[in-house]
């Protein structure tokens, strides 16, 4: 099976390398020539356009920043739709709006091209070690056919429903992650402002009910002042905006999500849009006039 992979960013590059390690033949594309060179050195081939990739691959994976990027690559000039033969499958592993997934799928289906929306969670560390969580929407038979391909990059791969369901699930995930980071930031800022060592507070609570994967991943980053992006604030704002747009469409209320998105937008205005989303703690630190350190 020859696999196309478009998008070799923070997540896409290690994901593509895991496919190579699993023995898949890979053809890649990205706007960053250094990323392409790195993956070629690991054993991949390259092509200049999405159309060129689609002409030679049975299945194409996209890992791109947002809905417009996926639409352009899938449906635009020199896009997948221009090169793919009937029966080709697009697995979009980007985090985009559920409505966009459905629109892209409909356009591709008219040309005999199937699609799964399969966003991931776990950030760069899990992309590197191949233990991502993948949440997938689309035809169950297509999911079953390409389960092993997705599993080569993941610890868990779960079918969540029809096309778009994968991205609804990812939005739910992103809401939980954002609110967890906000709660952690409030708690550690409280401890610091009250004169208690936040590292000791973290060690004391991590084994109890307040403990979580988010707490263990992000509290050390805050205390070490390490905001190297595993997942950028800019991208989390995008996800929360998509969650709010989706909630408006279905009549759900997300007041905490709206509040945290406002905080992240304030941080972006302060120049932290490209920082890791754990830098949400900086919003609370600024208000309290403290810095959360070990």
UniProtKB/Swiss-Prot annotation:
Q: Report residues binding NAD(+).
A: 4-18, 95, 238
Write out the GO biological process terms: D-glucarate catabolic process; galactarate catabolic process; glyoxylate metabolic process
The pathway noted for it is: Carbohydrate acid metabolism; galactarate degradation; D-glycerate from galactarate: step 3/3
What PROSITE patterns does the entry give?
Answer: 3_HYDROXYISOBUT_DH
Q: InterPro entries in the record, alphabetically?
A: 3-OH-isobutyrate_DH-rel_CS, 6-PGluconate_DH-like_C_sf, 6PGD_dom2, 6PGDH_NADP-bd, HIBADH-like_NADP-bd, HIBADH-related, NAD(P)-bd_dom_sf, Tartro_sem_red
Q: Keywords in UniProt for this one?
A: NAD, Oxidoreductase
Catalytic reaction(s) noted: (R)-glycerate + NADP(+) = 2-hydroxy-3-oxopropanoate + NADPH + H(+); (R)-glycerate + NAD(+) = 2-hydroxy-3-oxopropanoate + NADH + H(+)
Question: What triggers expression?
Answer: Induced by D-galactarate, D-glucarate and D-glycerate.
List, alphabetically, the Gene3D superfamilies matched.
N-(1-d-carboxylethyl)-l-norvaline Dehydrogenase, domain 2 (1.10.1040.10), NAD(P)-binding Rossmann-like Domain (3.40.50.720)
> Does the record bear NAD in its keywords?
yes
Determine the domain of life of the protein's source. Answer: Bacteria
Active site (catalytic residues): 170
Give the Gene Ontology MF terms in alphabetical order.
2-hydroxy-3-oxopropionate reductase activity; NAD binding; NADP binding
What EC number(s) would the UniProt record show? Answer: 1.1.1.60
* A Pfam family: NAD_binding_11
- What enzyme category does the UniProt record give? oxidoreductase
Which family, according to UniProt?
Belongs to the HIBADH-related family. 2-hydroxy-3-oxopropionate reductase subfamily.
Q: What is the purpose of this protein?
A: Catalyzes the reduction of tatronate semialdehyde to D-glycerate.
Protein known as = 2-hydroxy-3-oxopropionate reductase
